[in-house]
Amino acid sequence: DMEVLPVFDDEAVVAKAHSVTAALIQKHPDVAVIAGFDGSSGGGICPAVREAGKSGTIKVVMNDILPAHMECLKEGTAQYIVGQKRHIFGPIALQTLYDINHSGISFTERDGELGIYPAPDKVDPGFLVVTQDNFEDMDAMVKNLEKL
């Protein structure tokens, strides 16, 4: 049997993520997976898991490919980091703006008046998933970003 626990809000505060995670582990010592969906969550989750002596036992999934999160993965406290493909945000935006102004594609004779543009309404650039298997490549990417 598996029990799914309620969502706990750390309010994007590392210290709160730490205290919430520590309390969660104390109340549910057999918890199998903890996921943090805010960039600040991992910075509190990993130390709490480590302090409880549960590194590697509790699977940790974090959001945002940050240096601190990479350290958690490297040491084995976290197993997965999910991050946006930020490198392509700018190029996609520029291409979209260019297409709106220069594509020559129209749907009606009054596209501009009707708010119709030759571009997608939503763009999903996708995600990167960092694991031990691709750690070295993703770590190099993070270190290159730090130089900018």
Task: Give the location of each predicted region.
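Short helix-capping segments at alpha-helix termini
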Residues: 1-2, 26-30, 50-57
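Hinge/beta->alpha junction and helix N-cap segments in small-molecule ligand-binding domains
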Residues: 1-20, 35-41, 64-68, 84-89
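Conserved beta-strand scaffold positions in the cores of enzyme catalytic domains, especially
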Residues: 4-7, 60, 81, 129
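Beta-strand segments within the central parallel beta-sheet cores of soluble alpha/beta enzyme folds
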Residues: 5-6, 59-61, 112, 123
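Amphipathic, non-transmembrane alpha-helical secondary structure
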Residues: 15-18, 22-26, 43, 47, ...
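Venus flytrap/periplasmic-binding-protein-like
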Residues: 35-80
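Hinge/cleft segment of the Venus flytrap/periplasmic-binding protein
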Residues: 92-148
